[in-house]
């Protein structure tokens, strides 16, 4: 197996296969569950809006794919600074049966100089999650400034995040290697049990390999696993299956 094929295989096993569109329906989520069961093995998780968790759970159970985790989003996509609402949404997501919650950090508040609200929001949402995995989306493409990306990562980890994630996929700049370097470095300094999730903009096996390479260089080859590394993506899967010669070449897409 070539290095590119190895990267494609790994990326599938590390993927949060995602649909977070305004026109999502039960049928689109059912289709996503079927796609997550790939000829190259199951993806790590699917990521969907909270209201679709019950139909996703039913579908994955019917497919015998109980190992696929169900992730959802809260305080999404704008990263508002209302802690009470973020906590209520997170509690509701857990009550719906989410295995993992991806919450958006109040990044605009941080850009305006308010560090405390981000810390308090993540801390409160982690308490609401209990054993459910909490991934914190810092929206690195909007923060842009390396110092802000670093600070959002530090605050999230200090507040109890299980993962830090680059992006919502709803802004012009999503996952970048530059942001990955900063975020993975903070993990190496603070707590290597915290995971990293580049999301949006990873289009093919070569780009996936680049992100995996940065993680391995900073944290070691043994660090990367579904417990510590995920790709958030919608259009990436078809490209990876094509690399593995298990699907036709993907059509051009505007997908996440």
Swiss-Prot record:
One of its GO terms (molecular function) is deoxyribose-phosphate aldolase activity. The keyword Thylakoid does not apply. GO terms for biological process: 2-deoxyribose 1-phosphate catabolic process; carbohydrate catabolic process; deoxyribonucleotide catabolic process. The keyword Cell wall biogenesis/degradation does not apply. CDD domains: DeoC. HAMAP family: DeoC_type2 (MF_00592). This is Deoxyribose-phosphate aldolase.
């Amino acid at each position: 197996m070539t290095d590119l094929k190895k990267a494609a295989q790994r990326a599938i096993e590390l993927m949060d296969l995602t649909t977070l569109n305004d026109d999502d329906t039960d049928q689109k989520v059912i289709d996503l569950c079927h796609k997550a069961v790939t000829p190259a093995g199951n993806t790590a998780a699917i990521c969907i809006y909270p209201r679709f968790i019950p139909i996703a759970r039913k579908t994955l159970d019917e497919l015998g794919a109980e190992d696929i985790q169900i992730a959802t989003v809260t305080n999404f996509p704008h990263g508002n600074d209302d802690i009470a609402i973020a906590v209520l949404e997170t509690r509701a997501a857990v009550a719906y049966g989410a295995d993992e919650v991806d919450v958006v950090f109040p990044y605009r508040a941080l850009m305006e100089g308010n560090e405390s609200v981000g810390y308090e929001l993540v801390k409160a949402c982690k308490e609401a999650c209990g054993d459910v995995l909490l991934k914190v989306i810092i929206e690195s493409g909007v923060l842009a400034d390396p110092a802000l990306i670093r600070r959002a990562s530090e605050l999230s980890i200090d507040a109890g995040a299980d993962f830090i994630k680059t992006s919502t996929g709803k802004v012009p700049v999503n996952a970048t290697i530059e942001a990955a370097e900063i975020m993975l470095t903070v993990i190496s300094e603070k707590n290597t049990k915290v995971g990293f999730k580049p999301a949006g903009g990873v289009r093919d096996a070569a780009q996936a390999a680049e992100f995996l390479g940065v993680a391995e260089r900073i944290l070691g080859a043994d660090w990367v696993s579904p417990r510590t590394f995920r790709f958030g993506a919608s259009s990436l899967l078809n490209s990876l299956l094509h690399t593995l010669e298990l699907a036709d070449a993907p059509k051009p897409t505007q997908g996440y």
